[in-house]
Structures are given as structure tokens and as C-alpha cells.
Amino acid sequence: MNHTRVEQNRGRTARKLRLALMGPAFIAAIGYIDPGNFATNIQAGASFGYQLLWVVVWANLMAMLIQVLSAKLGIATGKNLAEQIRDHYPRPVVWFYWVQAEIIAMATDLAEFIGAAIGFKLILGVSLLQGAVLTGIATFLILMLQKRGQKPLEKVIGGLLLFVAAAYIVELFFSQPKLAELGKGMLIPSLPTSEAVFLAAGVLGATIMPHVIYLHSSLTQNLHDGSRKERYSATKWDVAIAMTIAGFVNLAMMATAAAAFHFSGHTKVAELDQAYLTLEPLLSHAAATIFGLSLVAAGLSSTVVGTLAGQVVMQGFVRFSIPLWVRRAVTMAPSFIVILMGLDPTRILVMSQVLLSFGIALALVPLLFFTSNKALMAELVNTPWVKRTGWAIVVLVVALNIWLLVGTALGL
């Protein structure tokens, strides 16, 4: 009897710990449903129907492993990835890492900020510039929550993630995809043309985000509840739940685009404005409005996460920090320049995703080295299969980046 009670108490304590430590992965997961994902998933679904859904499944599984490793580094060492690189690498390498990480954070922010501005433009009928002003105001308001600590921010960003997921459940209801074909697309790999290969690379680039690899390790480095093993176990639950939601959203985006556009002959839908305007007559005004609202929610939350990641990168690499509102103001500038110059926002979005994919390997290689180091990680060191899988992901990402670069240079 006593033994049973002890087991029950232990189970209750583990559940409480899981709940207490839930949140960091929800902030990281927002990076996986930003407007760049909207653009690439819609283009892939409209062009190839359900044929590239399997890419989303595999990219999401890879992303889960990467986020677990990042969170584990923070738990095991009490330092984030940027700080570990600063402590272990020569100064010129650290400065190179800082500069490229800042460029990638700004490229990410450009995509996310413009995505939210497009969302405001679509649902309110304002200009893109007015949408950008609204985005700026909204992100400043969300960032003010940081003064109250990490938990309130986790709740707001987690709420926005759940809103986007709910919006796409509704979109699936409106578009009514063929479930048998959808299941086949998720399970059976196919790359019918060279364009499909490029879109698959784009989907992978838009799914795995280098800035949240840096950020997640900083969100877990100051967790102190329970033992290290208990914190790691709770964090795996956090990542599994948050990344499953993000994966569902990505699958739903592509499936909705396939059902609404591809099978009604609109295979060339590639821009967010175009997707909104095409959804309205095909499905309904409500479906188009929900799409616009989900774009605003994803853009706002991901641009806030991008600002936080930029702060972590600067503090970690060069031990220097600026107020969050100053960073927010500085990183907004490129978005306003793009809008005022009248450049094509969706093209800028897609280009930023290509740039992003080059930062993935640069973040992954040191992450794998550090998490495989027994002296650093103790009992949380990577197992042999995690090492092998991690290096396989690095090789795949580098190969796809070279493919993308060559293809872009040759205009394929």
C-alpha cells in the first residue's frame, strides 16, 4: 500500500514538474511557423498537391531532435550555445559566429515582420507601410511583457501558437482535403521534378531555424526545478508537444494549399496576397480572413522571438547587450526600407529563407560537438545513435544548401 502511494506521489511530482517546465519549447516552436513557412508551404502545396507533405514530416522530426539537443545543452551546462562557443573557440571564430548570427537574426526578422505587415494589410485593407507600423507597435507591446519575467511571455506566445493551430483546423474544415491522398503524401517520399527538389529544400530551410537553436539553450539554462535528469525528461515532453503542434500547422498549411489551389487548377499561387485573394472565392470570406489573422499571429509572435534570439546571440558571443526596445527599433529598419523601396515582399521572404538555411549547419556543428562532450554534459551526453543522426542531418542540410546555391546561381 505504502509502495503504491509513493509511486503515485512520484508520478504526481513528475507531472507537476512537467507543467512547471512547460513553455520554452513553445517560444522556440514559433520559429517553425513563421511567415516564411507560410510562403514555402503554400507554394509547395499549390504546385505539387500532397506530394511534398513527407518533407514537412521529416523536417519536423529533425527539428524536434535539434531543439531537444539545444535545450539539453542549457540544462546540462547552465550556459547557452553562444556562450559555449565564446568559451571554447578562438576569438576570430567567435566574432565570425556573432556577425553571421546577427545577420541571420535580421534576415529572419525581415521575413517575420513583413509577413505580419502583409497580414494586417489583407485583413484591415490598409497599405503595407501602415501594416508595418501596426506590426511595430504590436511587437513593442508584446516585448514589454519581458519585464515581468519569462513566464508571461511564454503564455502569450504559446497562446498565439495555439491560435494559429486552431485557425488551420478551421482551414482544413473549409478546404476538405482528401484524407487517403494526404496520408500517402505524408508517408511516401516523392520528388517529381527539379522544381520539387528546390521547394523541398526551401521547406527544410524554412522549418529548421538557426536563431531558435541559440535561443532554446538560453531559455533552459536557468531552470532549477528538480534534478538535471528530471529537467531533461520534462523538457523532452515540452519539445514533443510544442513541435507536434508546429508540425501539424505546417502540414495543414500545405494540405490546405493543395486542396484549395492545386486541385482547382490554381497551381501558380506563390504569394501571400495571392493566396488570400484566391482563397476568398474558392472557399469563403471567412476562410480568407482566418488565413490573414493566422498570418498576423504567426508574424507577430515570431518577430518577438527573433528579437529575443538576437539579444541572446549578442550577450552570449560578445558579453554586450542593448535594451530590447533599441534592438527592436534597429531590426525594424530593413523591413521599412524594403517596403518604402517598393520591393516584392514575398520575393524578399523567400530570399531570406535561403539565407537562413546557410546558418543551420553553422549552429548545428558546435551544438553536436558540445552535446557529445562527456566532460561538459556528464550523464546527459549524446548517445551514439543521436550523434549519428545529428551528423546525418548536418550532411543533408549542407548538401541541400549547395544544391540551392548552385540552382539559384544558374537560375534553375
Curated annotation (Swiss-Prot):
Give the membrane topology: Multi-pass membrane protein
MF-aspect GO terms: cadmium ion transmembrane transporter activity; manganese ion transmembrane transporter activity; metal ion binding; symporter activity
Which InterPro entries has this protein been placed in?
NRAMP_fam
Q: Does the keyword Secreted apply?
A: no
Residue spans crossing the bilayer: 19-39, 46-66, 94-114, 122-142, 156-176, 196-216, 241-261, 290-310, 322-342, 348-368, 392-412
A GO cellular component annotation in the UniProt record: plasma membrane
Which keywords accompany this UniProt record?
Cell inner membrane, Cell membrane, Ion transport, Membrane, Symport, Transmembrane, Transmembrane helix, Transport
Q: Which family does it belong to?
A: Belongs to the NRAMP family.
Reported function: H(+)-stimulated, divalent metal cation uptake system.
HAMAP family per the UniProt record, alphabetical: NRAMP
Name of the protein: Divalent metal cation transporter MntH
